[in-house]
């Protein structure tokens, strides 16, 4: 079994390398067909998108936060959390929502404004000649395919899983848990630094559009407002649904990824890893499309973990006896608080 899995992993990585080269080859072909002359109008934002640039800039700076808050209010108003947002759930969701917005920008700023100019000082804006469409697809593929692998490996490598399990501990879906991640998992998002590097190389405008579009798709996939249901309900929309659910992440496919079981034929936590694009799961055979939603979410033995252990493991460890997060560095608070939990293997540990 291990040999088969290793062979599949090797095959998938090889296919990924080929996919990474596609936008590069397309840009090279364009460059050859134009005899090395890139039209100024091709580098700039297409005229039909020019009007949207201010909107995208506002969405990037504050609009996405407002979008999340508005969706969250609607979700709570509709009673979609079923009174599950209590205790440790509330603490970890709020902290994971606020902390990255305060702590991550300085990290990215240091990488973009200090590290990159020091490491590759002569390469700034060297890709500024790339047409907008080329830069868009280059960043979209490089960013999202990299995140697919980052996500997939955090499910398939037991040690890495402990950094990602925080995101799967929520017994509900929605804006409240969309940002719920271990901070170390977030800081080491490989695609963040990849996109920052491509922006430094001169692809800032395409990066802006990719960021906004990707954020809206991923937030929509986490939302408990199942916007994709009408596409499954009405037969006339089925052709559109067929394309959508294979191209991008939808509530149905991503909710299945957060299910607490795979035994019902709906949940699929061992797949559906795609973030913006679901097509990676289609290509690599890790996807499951049922057009149905799980009855319950989370993990079987991971309820109400302490917020500090979920957010900062292994710096802080859980006080819950038997928890995989109990093997940390620091016990906090200092006064022990032992809580017995059922001795069973979490469903998601079986990876």
Spans of model-derived segments:
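Membrane-helix interface motif
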Residues: 26-44, 109-120
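Membrane-embedded catalytic scaffold of the fatty acid hydroxylase/desaturase
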Residues: 96-111, 118-293
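N-terminal membrane topogenic signal
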Residues: 2-21, 56-59
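Membrane-water interface of transmembrane alpha-helices
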Residues: 69-80, 149-159
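Cytoplasmic membrane-interface regions of multi-pass membrane proteins
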Residues: 1, 77-86
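Alpha-helical transmembrane segments in multi-pass membrane proteins
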Residues: 16, 42-75, 87-105
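A membrane-cytosol interface segment of integral membrane proteins
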Residues: 206, 290-351
